[in-house]
Amino acid sequence: MAVDFPVKAIHGGTGKRQREKTRKNVLDFSASTNPFPPKVNWEPDLHLLEYYPDDYYTELKERIGSIFHRDITEICVGNGSIELIRVFCSVVFRNGISRNRFYLQSPTFGEYELSARLSAATPTIVPSDAGVYFLCNPNNPTGLLTKKEKTLALLDEMKYHKGILFCDEAFIELSDPSQSVAEISDPSLFVLRSLTKSFAVPGIRFGYGFGEPALIEKIETARSPWSVNAFAESYALEALGHMEELEGSRSAIERERHWLSSAISALGLRSYPSSVNYILVECGQDASSLCNELIRKDILVRDCTSFGLPTSIRIAVRTHEENIQLIEALAACVH
């Protein structure tokens, strides 16, 4: 019997495609990467390509473990965080580890639902019925940060109902890392991290996660062999030594976010409170039409229609000069 196949999730970060399409230098506000990343002194070593990576990634896991005070048996790595979302869902939903129902906040990152559905799980509107509760923290696209106290309360609820709290902290280093639960070991908790956003390297696909050893062993078994390529591993080893420098990034982002929010409000648009390097904006008109107008002005923003928000856009915080260009283009489109 034919079964409806899930629809591919939509993402921002289409600047390269737009530049190739229009032959113009488009300013990409759709990709929410760090506009003030640490200076990582790294260059690709071509000799690394002569060997297979260590598929256990022992050195890499030891480096991660030393930062987050976790044993390497509690750490998994993957070709970007999305690979780990996919593998996690495959492991827990298809192997009887959890009930094949999931709960997620709305709006939120589309890959959770897609990955869960690909593993034959179905959504529920009742958190206590879920085998997995997906928490994006800070949330994408709203920028809302769930405080640690509330996250731990959610964890207690999932433990009580014999479920798993999946906490995606891809953006938390650009928000408030003191609210992270990455250092907490609990059989009912899986925490996801990524270098993409914090270090502004979407071309380096590297994600990592934390969970109980039994779950991590299954994820590492289900993951494709050598899925973290030699360049990604090499870059990650260097970048992880620069985590403390992200404090400067957070300060600069906060300053620019406040300026950008005020400038957006001055245009008569509603910007939602955000804790991170992007802002959700209610534009009071069809988002797709506004995005097309902005493209004609060489500005790319994230159309939030795919989030179920057809009159909203998501805007990344960039440098002050770039943010001024955005506001000027936005002003021309809404007035």
Task: For each feature predicted by the language model, list its residue ranges.
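N-terminal "arm"/small-domain region of PLP-dependent enzymes with the aminotransferase-like
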Residues: M1-Y56, R63-S66
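Conserved PLP-binding catalytic core of the aspartate aminotransferase-like
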Residues: A266-K297
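Short, conserved charged micro-motifs
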Residues: V40, D286-N292, E322-Q325
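PLP-dependent aminotransferase class I/II
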Residues: D55, S188-S265, L269-Y272
